[in-house]
A protein has these predicted regions:
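Acidic-glycine-rich active-site phosphate/pyrophosphate-binding loop
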Residues: 41-56
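Active-site pocket-lining segments that scaffold enzyme catalytic pockets across diverse folds
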Residues: 20-41
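Glycine/aspartate-rich loop-and-adjacent alpha/beta segment that forms the canonical ThDP
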Residues: 181-232
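Thiamine diphosphate
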Residues: 55-192, 202-206
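Short, small-residue-biased leader/transition segments that mark boundaries at the very start
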Residues: 8-21
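Iron-sulfur cluster-binding cysteine motifs and their immediate structural context
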Residues: 216-238, 245, 249-266
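Glycine-rich, acidic loop regions that bind phosphate or pyrophosphate groups
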Residues: 1
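Short, ordered loop/turn segments at secondary-structure junctions
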Residues: 49, 122-125, 169, 195-196, ...
Length: 267
């Protein structure tokens, strides 16, 4: 037993650790959406969840974070204070669980007060930041029992939103098209980017690899900030196969076919 008057000695180790900012997971479906917003130079009123990390470089698109549900009400407030033209390069971003928690009432207020603006619901089918709990739109209770699932697109339409667009978060061309079209409208628009959290699917995925002989060192694949991507000393890029989830975002950005799937026999 160890008593109060006893002393103990231990060796102290001094480690030199690389400074690292908090970032989205490899393969996170939010990363492609934020890449598009960054590319289009659109600001985002943020909310509480994994997607808050969109404030961190190199994505750097989330400019406000107050509390759960405040992304939509912040966008609403900007529109009323500064006018609809001011928010043409702004969107609100909010997760599916947070939208059902306190975002839906903010969207109701936008409709009630005849606001304009674009809301992006980042629907990853879970409550990712706090441990992957189910919520009212997943179809399961917290005990894992089947239950009624709230239909988020139908809920938005029931509130009165006429412009409800659903896209695959992995399809960055579709995301970009939807964002460009909806922010141009003088009405409330809701874009729902629907792709499950990468941590929910434990199945084996195809991996990607780079061909340094084809790499032009342009850095396009590095812009989304995937932690599996590393720039080598010579400017080419390598992919860490222990971190790659096979999402394919990097390959979709490479114009030189320098990133391709690893063949099954080459793993």
């Amino acid at each position: 037993p160890f008593f109060f008057n006893d002393t103990a000695t231990t060796e102290i180790y001094t480690l030199s650790l690389h400074d690292a900012l908090p970032i989205l997971c490899p393969g996170c479906p939010h990363r492609g959406v934020y890449y598009v917003l960054n590319k289009l130079k659109i600001h985002a009123a943020g909310d509480i969840g994994c997607y808050t990390l969109g404030a961190v470089a190199p994505l750097s698109v989330v400019d406000t974070t107050i509390c759960m549900g405040a992304s939509i009400s912040s966008l609403h407030g900007m529109e009323k204070a500064k006018g609809k033209e001011y928010i043409k390069n702004w969107v609100a971003v909010i997760g599916d669980s947070t939208f059902l928690h306190t975002g839906v009432n903010s969207l109701m207020n936008m409709m009630y007060n005849k606001a304009t603006g674009t809301v992006i619901i980042l629907d990853n089918s879970t409550t990712g930041m706090t441990g992957h709990q189910d919520h009212a739109a997943t179809g399961k209770t917290l005990q894992g029992d089947p239950t009624y699932a709230i239909d988020i697109p139908a809920l938005c339409r029931a509130i009165g939103v006429k412009n409800v667009v659903e896209v695959n978060a992995r399809d960055i061309q579709a995301v970009e098209k939807a964002v460009k079209e909806e922010i141009a409208k003088d009405e409330v628009s809701v874009i729902i980017t629907k792709t499950p959290c990468v941590l929910l699917d434990k199945s084996k995925k195809p991996l990607y690899q780079t061909h340094t002989d084809k790499c032009k060192k342009c850095g396009m694949c590095m812009k989304p900030g995937c932690p599996a991507m590393t720039k080598n000393a010579d400017g080419t890029v390598s992919i860490d196969d222990t971190m790659c989830t096979g999402c394919g975002l990097c390959a979709s950005l490479c114009k030189f076919d320098a990133i391709e799937l690893v063949k099954e026999g080459d793993r």
